[in-house]
Amino acid sequence: MLLVAVGLVSCGDDDKPYIPELNKLTSVTCTKNGNAFFNADITYDQDKQINRIILTTEGNQFTDNYIIVDKTISVSGVKMVDGSPTNPFVHTVYTLSGNMIAAKEEKSENKYMSNAVYTAVENRYTYSSNWLKSVSQVIQWPNENGSGYQTREMGEVDRYSWENGNVVHYAYLPQQEITYEYDSQLRPENFPFRVVNSFRPVGFDMISPLNLLYGKMNQNLPTRAYWYNVSAATDICAEYTFRYTLTGDYITGMTIEEKINPVNGVTAENNTYEYAFVYNFVAEQK
């Protein structure tokens, strides 16, 4: 209705329909079987960029500050190492190409060299027409005698397959793959759901606003996902069904039913995850 009404008052060739920008996601609350699972609060700066994410999970609270300089996003905060929190430091660095993440460096502290910060994992992202297609990886670890580091090129570790504007397969090469199914329900532009490199798609990373920097997003919302080992694709290890609550133009709720199957000695398990979304960052209106 909005588009029709605006079209009636547009008179010149230069007039374009104005579609108000949707508010940005500012809070995510998730429960697992009725108990707190995680909570995330997101703030933005005056340029509508992520400024801070406070994530509370498993009784621990992590405050990450996002520092954007040119084409680099540095994330400063605390990490958990062996169950204990570190001192705050820049633990993740993203490098942008255009408006897309081209590389991600995960930092660690070298306990053999006075906690010197080093790059433990570097991910490099490959896109085709702005679709994320694959991720290659380099890992590094310190020598225990403090003499330096060892490095290993892992090559391509993640692969994404797209059909009809949606990721239908994510593969962790070469062993595992997860398949996603969709219906016609569209993903709102401000709902940052993304197929991430996980075979348990229930965490904050799959709906973090940072996902909007990984090129084109899914056109639709998934209804089901299931993963399996490539060598035994008929044995589904776990499956997930998705339901959504839509209020106006906003996804305000999501339910994920998790069914873990007794495959390869794993104990069967059923879980229900309930998500609530709040959008309190009002985009600038004309």
Regions picked out by a protein language model, each given a short descriptive name:
Residues 7-10:
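C-terminal motif of bacterial Sec signal peptides marking the signal peptidase cleavage site
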